[in-house]
Curated annotation (Swiss-Prot):
Keywords: 4Fe-4S, Cell inner membrane, Cell membrane, Iron, Iron-sulfur, Membrane, Metal-binding, NAD, Quinone, Repeat, Translocase, Ubiquinone. One of its GO terms (biological process) is aerobic respiration. [4Fe-4S] cluster 1 binds at residues 99, 102, 105, 148. GO terms for cellular component: plasma membrane. It is found in: Cell inner membrane. It comes from the Bacteria. Residues 90-119, 129-158 form the 4Fe-4S ferredoxin-type domain. InterPro entries: 4Fe4S_Fe-S-bd, 4Fe4S_Fe_S_CS, NADH_quinone_OxRdtase_chainI. Its main location: membrane. This is NADH-quinone oxidoreductase subunit I. It comes from Sulfurimonas denitrificans (strain ATCC 33889 / DSM 1251). One of its GO terms (molecular function) is quinone binding. Binds 2 [4Fe-4S] clusters per subunit.
């Protein structure tokens, strides 16, 4: 009974009368032969859109106002909190690896690209024997740096890591701070995602509710 009601309503629908809000569009037939396609292209060319695009190109050539940079000879500056290839920090006191092998970064990684192997040393303290990050799977979300209790893993500014070999994307020693950089005192600490960039007070307008 229900199906018969639906069929009756479908057959009695009004599809002939058009509302005043609608109007018929005169669609030109699609050309099927070569001459028809040629005439259609000619009509589109002399309509004006082609000359508008050519005028824009000619105008920018005369102005010599270049809006691009010559990469890789020129590079755009990167913010201090840009999330690029990871950096593994060392301790300032002993120059040893700061990672304690807690495994929080491995647990929170949503792309499952961090692997940590640990063991107990002669003093029954946990020691990291293997730490690897598969950059081919990493989405650079920053959760590993945010959850690290020792600020051992951070994001750096190195983004040129293209390669045609997958094994090149699994690295650790390349991310560890070099000893000469530690001795020079140039290792940058992680300011945190909630911290503002340096000299930001000069550019940010303070409000009464600023904290």
């Amino acid at each position: 009974m229900h199906n018969e009601h639906i069929e009756e309503h479908f057959n009695n629908r009004n599809v002939t009368e058009l509302s005043s809000e609608y109007y018929m569009v005169d669609i030109a037939p699609y050309p099927t032969d070569g001459w028809g396609k040629f005439t259609r292209t000619l009509r589109r060319a002399i309509r004006g859109e082609l000359f508008v695009g050519l005028w824009v190109v000619l105008r920018e050539m005369i102005r010599f106002d270049i809006h691009t940079i010559q990469y890789p000879l020129e590079k755009m500056p990167i913010g201090p909190r840009y999330r690029a290839v990871h950096e593994m920090k060392r301790l300032w006191e002993s120059d040893t690896e700061r990672c304690i092998g807690c495994g929080l970064c491995e647990k929170i990684c949503i792309s499952n690209c961090i692997r940590i192997d640990t063991k107990l040393d002669e003093n029954s303290r946990k020691e990291v024997t293997e730490y690897s990050i598969n950059l081919g799977r990493c989405i650079f979300c920053g959760y590993c740096a945010e959850v690290c209790p020792e600020l051992a893993i951070t994001h750096g500014g190195e983004y040129e890591n293209a390669s045609d070999q997958r094994e090149h994307f699994i690295m650790y020693q390349d991310m560890l701070t070099p000893l000469d950089k530690m001795k020079a005192g140039t290792q940058k600490e992680f300011e945190g995602f909630g911290a503002i960039t340096p000299h930001e007070d000069e550019r940010v307008k303070k409000t009464p509710l600023a904290y």
